[in-house]
């Protein structure tokens, strides 16, 4: 069995790491290169860097920051934000990213994901899905939750069902899915395990859980109950509540295979 991964996430806005609650109410958490260096030293399995306003501001992700980060950290680096065309992916990979996350552009042009996977290999294409729980639906007399995907850093609703979208992205060639519960983001109440289960049971690519971690138990629940392959967190690491080592030790103690 493959070891499960812990991935600290750096949401970056105007060159600073920030952390919000449900995609708003933003707090400063430091310089991205310094923060990434700290997680590299703590034994993070990967680091994710998301330029959270690149799409809504219609600009490119800061390549210079990615270059500096890639020189400093020696674990796989996933970069996203403002990725709209093949050249953006090439530039990010050339700047030192190991994987590139596509979010809004996948919604506008789904075939872009397939084209990117074909050109660069699906191992370096991550599709990021920002999902919000909407009105429940009835299926065969059973009330089921339904999630919809949002774009532009969680600002624009699409009407697209998140679970069906996850399947479509996996079929088109995404090597991995980064699934964020917008309802959970920054709330510290735990992942949306129902959402994670719905997606992990329907796709055959790795799924990363994101949105809502408040303690180490939440990380373990993502794997044990949500069925995910990797757990992403920000607040609990950024503000010094836990280190990555503590998180790994806790998960290993729960019987989860980790790289210690």
Swiss-Prot record:
UniProt KW keywords: Amino-acid biosynthesis, Cytoplasm, Histidine biosynthesis, Lyase
Catalytic reaction list: 5-[(5-phospho-1-deoxy-D-ribulos-1-ylimino)methylamino]-1-(5-phospho-beta-D-ribosyl)imidazole-4-carboxamide + L-glutamine = D-erythro-1-(imidazol-4-yl)glycerol 3-phosphate + 5-amino-1-(5-phospho-beta-D-ribosyl)imidazole-4-carboxamide + L-glutamate + H(+)
Catalytic site positions: 11, 130
Localization per record: Cytoplasm
Family: Belongs to the HisA/HisF family.
Quaternary structure note: Heterodimer of HisH and HisF.
Protein name stated in the entry: Imidazole glycerol phosphate synthase subunit HisF
Organism: Psychrobacter arcticus (strain DSM 17307 / VKM B-2377 / 273-4)
The organism's taxonomic lineage, starting at the top: Bacteria, Pseudomonadati, Pseudomonadota, Gammaproteobacteria, Moraxellales
């Amino acid at each position: 069995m493959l070891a499960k991964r812990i991935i600290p996430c750096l949401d970056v806005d105007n060159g600073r790491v920030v952390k919000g609650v449900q995609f708003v109410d933003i707090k400063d958490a430091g310089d991205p290169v310094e923060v990434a260096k700290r997680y590299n030293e703590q034994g993070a399995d990967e680091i994710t860097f998301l330029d959270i306003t690149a799409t809504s501001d219609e600009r490119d992700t800061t390549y210079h920051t990615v270059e500096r980060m890639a020189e400093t950290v020696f674990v796989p680096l996933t970069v996203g934000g403002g990725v709209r065309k093949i050249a953006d992916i090439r530039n990010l990979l050339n700047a030192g990213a190991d994987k590139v996350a596509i979010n809004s552009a996948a919604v506008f042009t789904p075939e872009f994901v397939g084209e990117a996977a074909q050109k660069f290999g699906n191992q370096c294409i991550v599709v990021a899905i920002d999902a919000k729980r909407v009105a429940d639906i009835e299926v065969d007399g059973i009330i089921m939750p339904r999630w919809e995907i949002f774009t532009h850093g969680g600002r624009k609703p699409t009407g697209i069902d998140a679970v069906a979208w996850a399947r479509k992205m996996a079929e088109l060639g995404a090597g991995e899915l980064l699934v964020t519960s917008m309802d959970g983001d920054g709330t510290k109440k735990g992942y949306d395990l129902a959402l994670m289960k719905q997606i992990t049971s329907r796709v055959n690519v790795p799924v990363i859980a994101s949105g809502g971690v408040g303690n180490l138990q939440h990380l373990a629940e993502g794997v044990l109950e949500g069925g995910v392959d990797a757990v992403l967190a920000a607040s609990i690491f950024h503000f010094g509540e836990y280190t990555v080592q503590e998180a790994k030790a806790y998960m290993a103690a729960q019987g989860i295979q980790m790289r210690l």
